[in-house]
């Protein structure tokens, strides 16, 4: 059975990426808080870039990579959990892919799944 990542609710519209990072950190038993992460990285007008999130996780000894997935069936080949840039506007954490469903933690909606 796949363990869920913690649900971290975003407090502002532009903190979805930061919340996804915190969810991954808590999944791996970190005790850091959202405030700790906010202090560690500057926020741009539109929130955080993929590069910002990678830098934040790399500082914490995470090995990060960036992938562009055009076929949703290929997600299951990637290491989970992962942070995904969803619909070109929002970050979510994908924590499980099973049969024809992808399971995500969305910082604005909580746990949801989509069929593909």
What are the residue ranges of the model-derived segments?
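Conserved active-site-adjacent core of cysteine acyl-enzyme catalytic domains
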Residues: 1-116
């Amino acid at each position: 059975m796949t363990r869920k990542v913690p649900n971290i609710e975003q407090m502002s519209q532009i903190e979805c990426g930061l919340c996804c990072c915190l969810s991954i950190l808590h999944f791996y038993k970190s005790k850091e808080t959202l405030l700790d992460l906010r202090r560690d990285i500057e926020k741009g007008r539109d929130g955080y870039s993929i590069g910002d999130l990678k830098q934040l996780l790399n500082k914490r000894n995470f090995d990060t990579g960036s992938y562009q997935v055009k076929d949703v069936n290929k997600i299951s080949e990637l290491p989970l959990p992962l942070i995904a840039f969803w619909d070109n506007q929002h970050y979510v954490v994908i924590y499980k892919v099973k049969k024809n469903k992808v399971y995500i933690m969305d910082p604005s909606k909580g746990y949801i799944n989509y069929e593909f």
